[in-house]
Amino acid sequence: MRIYQITELPNPQMNVIIHPSYFPSISHFLAIAKADVVTFEMEDNFQKQTNRNRVYIYSPNGIQLLNVPVKHSKEAHQRTKDVKLETAFDWQKQHFKSLEAAYRTSPFFEYFEDDIRPVFQKKHTFLMDLNLETMSIISKCLRLEFDYNETTEYFHKITDKKDFRNLINGKKDTAVFEPYTQVFGEKHGYLNNLSILDLLFNEGRYALEYLKKQQL
């Protein structure tokens, strides 16, 4: 996997730690855009009902949750990097159909469609590999380049990095951002901090500039 390196660093020496997630929220990519170096948390235990395997998009009926099905282990504590994807049904096809229904009429869906579609056709074994690939794809689409490393041990408290790991819990991810035009905004109003896909399909190449103007 290749993730591109930022050429303009808004805050040199800023190192953030964050969870890889499935087409992450806008706040996730804002944290990355503000960073000099990104550290991905690889040693955490998997928790249900978090954004490790779910994403929120703006559908014709309002906010919609897309959940990535995983195989649950009998072990009390299973590391996220060891979690395997459920392959009993074609959830990838369902997810892409949902994205088409939500964003086919957006300004930039067709522009990025060929970049996004392949990940829904590829069969991954592990959730972590899927998450990292979706982040790599989005980084390329945004032209957002950054250096990154991975943890080799879990620490509850981090003192040498800006800790954004709480963003993986959607209930604690309460950041509010400047509104931008959304496909169904006139029908349902502005929906804040959805998947980065929502920003990408609506703002296109301007999405990175939008991120740089926001505060987290």
Predicted region positions:
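Residues lining hydrophobic/aromatic ligand-binding pockets adjacent to catalytic sites
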Residues: 2-216
